[in-house]
Amino acid sequence: MAFPIAVALLVFPAIVGLLSPYATADYVLFTGEVLMAGQNLTNGQYRLAMQANCDLILYEGEIPIWGANTVGRGDDCYLGLKQNGELVVRRGVHYTLWSSSIKSKKGKYALVLDGNGRLGIYGQRRWTSSNQKEVGLLDGSTVTTEYVLFSGDRLMPPRKLKYKNYELEFMRCNLVIKDDQSERILWQTSTDARSCYARLETDGELTVKHKGQLLWGSNRKGSNGPYIAVLRFDGRLDVFGPLRWTHDGHHDSLSSNASFPSKI
């Protein structure tokens, strides 16, 4: 996974060149985290790679489909997501080489590489589950699969979200976050019915329903738009949105014009 920015800048010289280019299956970057040289966001055949030559490249398989054109402009470069929702490639602490150029209010944001090769920045954070942050070591042998729910999507058995040993799933009609290693229930909706599904609404509210009847809601609504619910590395579930910035590498070349994608 990515490093917190303060930690990354302290340990950068010690770890550069030691990370495998396929070292992570994460495809979400949170505010305050960075991708350093050799690290990636990876979702299926798509990979956003921060390379040792300072360039940020989006790959489809082994084919580059977009780049930030920052190659050769430093040897201590990293990708970061700022508290104003701006995505930046920097060298050193403050020298910006590339920017998404879209800024919002100070808060917590999330960058997602989806399964179709699109990048999106969502924020601010609208809601978070009430359980405490988990601070134990994650199971490195557990493969991270699907851990993001997009607005308009339903989560119903047997589908579940899973990040390492954390799972968001239904136990009968009760939506729970569970530590799969210890079998502990970290959070739950305490809902009860014969059949249920969870849905992330287009106003950002997370709901549990039975045949369209509302059984539970997060009670945090925003303006209509695309939102995401993310099962985090600390065992909590966060909702971010709406979508602030997006980029589809399939629709841009590797020219400098592709360095500043569109605002939503």
Predicted feature residues:
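Beta-rich ligand-binding surfaces for carbohydrates and other polyanions
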Residues: 2-264
